[in-house]
A protein has these predicted regions:
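Short beta-strand segments
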Residues: 158, 236-237, 273, 386-387
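Active-site beta-strand/loop microenvironment that shapes enzyme catalytic pockets
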Residues: 212-257
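N-terminal extension/subdomain marker
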Residues: 1-190, 194, 198, 221-224, ...
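C-terminal amphipathic alpha-helical segment
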Residues: 274-342
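Catalytic or ion-translocation cores adjacent to nucleophile or general acid/base/metal-coordination motifs
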Residues: 240-302
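Glycine-rich phosphate-binding "P-loop"
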Residues: 186-209, 334-338
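Charged substrate- and nucleic-acid-binding regions of tRNA-handling and nucleotidyl-transfer enzymes
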Residues: 344-429
């Protein structure tokens, strides 16, 4: 493999006769407060080849079933390597995902060089997280990565490719490429199609487009205030903690390897899909919060008191949010926000509120309707904190000029539109 930060890979897929439903399953960090979703998925996948059998839904992290599931995952990976993953693509996979609104999201699946990525605060590598990485979330995920012989990605990267040089040219010639899969995804995930990109000339074109995005002079023209900084080529759009876990595992493995092994070991790379942030099919959605164990009236009073304690702002604030529970909804305007984005101010409030209220917990929810539903039971006090829309134009600007955004700031699309596990790659030797 080349030293590019994103490159062609040996990608594995099941035989052509294996249907996407139930082979492909949604990212494990979705529907964490809705175990019934995962029960339905398991029913659909029972006794059939499915990536659900080689991943650990976060709904099961820390449960008595965790150890048994991890053992089952490792056994199933070995079975799939021998008898299920019978097709190999050496190159990229061009994908098209038809979303709930009918738009088609284009992407390229390849391998991220983990030596070109870092989640450490203040680092400026070619590949950067768009949000803060909560390092405490990595160890539970490392349990899955350690000892695994396969990986299957739900990581989605974003390229700042205003001229559409990287992905879109492949889409124009997709009918000339070998088709790989074409079908519906389980539980309302939409339609997914994929084509193999193995022609050396096409791979060279993709690599050249990536090299142009990494050009220091072009980066300095785009971001004059960041002149002299290493160019940022890709930002992590989704799956930040999955990529961070792959990085942590690679750093853990490195000291056990020779210099030659470090250059070629498959765990140095992580499969991911790259999309163009400028695509009209890429929607950046706010991630809402649901606070369990407290009603909206009580939370409103606490938030109002906390806001007043922040001191007097010298400028007019435009930070707005909504609080909702089973009894209704109210609008909130923050007068003295301590952070530049509403989500940052909310996180600062929760950082003070939660330790002072034992038994109150928070979950991060994709989709306003889901957040409202979770806070709608009068018998179980809960409040949905509904955040305003997030402008995707601010994403690269915020990361390049200001560092990472607050954790759980945004999500790319609705929960059902997350990347499904599909392609696989060997990471063990």
């Amino acid at each position: 493999m080349s030293e590019a930060c994103f490159t062609a890979a040996d990608i594995l897929l099941p035989a052509a006769g294996v249907p996407l439903d139930p082979w492909a399953c949604i990212a494990v960090d979705q529907f964490t407060s809705q175990p019934e979703y995962w029960q339905r998925a398991e029913h659909l996948a029972d006794g059939k080849p499915s990536t659900l059998h080689i991943v650990l839904p976060e709904a099961y992290l820390g449960t008595p079933q965790e150890a048994e599931r991890l053992e089952s995952i490792r056994r199933t990976m070995e079975e799939y390597r021998k008898s299920v993953l019978t097709r190999k693509v050496h190159g990229y996979v061009y994908v098209e995902r038809t979303q709930m609104d009918g738009t088609v999201r284009q992407g390229l699946v390849g391998a991220v060089d983990l030596d070109a990525y870092d989640y450490a605060k203040g680092s400026k590598p070619a590949i950067r997280p768009s949000e803060s990485t909560v390092v405490e979330r990595i160890p539970p995920r490392l349990k899955v990565r350690r000892g695994a012989t396969l990986e299957t990605p739900h990581v989605m990267m974003l390229a700042d490719d205003a001229d559409c040089t990287l992905i879109e040219p492949i889409g124009l010639i997709k009918n000339q490429l070998p088709p790989l899969y074409d079908g519906e995804l389980m539980l309302g995930g939409g339609h997914l199609r994929g084509w193999a990109v193995e022609d050396p000339a096409l791979i060279a074109g993709i690599d050249a487009a990536l090299a142009a995005l990494a050009d220091p002079a072009a980066f300095a023209r785009r971001w004059p205030a960041a002149k002299g900084q290493q160019p940022m080529v890709l930002a992590v759009g989704d799956g930040n903690h999955s990529l961070a876990t792959a990085k942590a595992y690679w750093e853990e493995l490195k000291p056990t390897l020779s210099e030659e092994q470090r250059r070629t070991h498959p765990a140095r790379w992580c499969l991911a899909e790259v999309c163009n942030v400028h695509s009209s099919a890429i929607e950046i959605e706010p991630i809402h919060r649901v606070v369990f164990g407290v009603g909206a009236k009580e939370l409103y009073a606490a938030l109002d008191a906390w806001d007043q304690q922040q001191g007097s702002s010298t400028t007019m604030s435009d930070q707005r949010l909504r609080l909702a529970d089973a009894h209704g909804e109210s609008a909130v305007a923050l007068a003295n926000p301590p952070a530049p984005l509403t989500v940052g101010s909310v996180e600062a409030f929760l950082a003070d509120f939660l330790p002072a209220h034992p038994g109150v917990t928070v979950d991060y929810i994709h989709g306003e309707s889901t957040a409202l539903a979770l806070a709608s039971d009068p018998a179980k006090p809960a409040t949905a904190i509904l955040l305003p829309d997030f402008a995707k134009a601010d994403l690269f600007k915020g990361v390049v000029l200001g560092g990472v955004l607050p954790s759980k700031t945004f999500s790319m699309g609705h929960a059902e539109e997350k990347r499904y596990y599909n392609e696989c790659r060997v990471i063990g030797v």
